[in-house]
Amino acid sequence: MSAYPPKLAAIVSLFEGLPEDEKRETLISYADQAARCAPVENESYDLEDVRKDEECTDTVGIFLKVTGANPCRQVHFRVSLGPQVQILTKAMTSILCKGLDSSTIEKVLEVPADFVPRIVGGQLVRVRSQTVYYVLTRMKSACRAFLNRERSAANG
């Protein structure tokens, strides 16, 4: 069984079949779709984490919505990106919003980061090592924060 949620596994599989130049073109195409991942006006979120970190060139906001009941709760991410965010971060945002959509919190937390070089290629991982993992790290942090807040409310 794949360690990746099915939608992310399909994206990884697509990239693995592409030569390097087509991988870059496909990454640019995903980056162009990043605006579709932005938070929707008048939609409420269970967790919002907007900040500027050292690892990224601009502010990134992670918006987490959890639907359903335990143990089948599903996560839905929206991400706001500042205007200075790099193309690779935009591409990873789009890939992760699509690839992790409707996964369980637990599945998101278990996603190994080894899919990143399979998508972007080894060269870009070396050159942009912080950038390519940044959005995944933030999404996992949002899931952990949601679970911690939920535990505190249950124990409080």
Regions found by a protein language model. Name each.
Residues D58-G68:
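Short beta-strand elements
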Residues V40-E48:
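Short Pro/Gly-enriched beta-strand edge/turn motifs at strand-loop
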Residues A69-Q86, C97-D101:
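Conserved interaction-surface patches within small, structured recognition/assembly domains
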Residues E106-G156:
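C-terminal binding/interaction regions
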Residues M1-A35:
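Charge-rich, low-complexity N-terminal segments
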Residues L88-T93:
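Catalytic-loop motifs flanking and including active-site residues across diverse enzymes
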Residues I95-L109:
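Long, amphipathic alpha-helical coupling/dimerization segments that relay conformational signals between
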Residues V50-E54:
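Short Gly/Pro-enriched turn/cap motifs at secondary-structure boundaries
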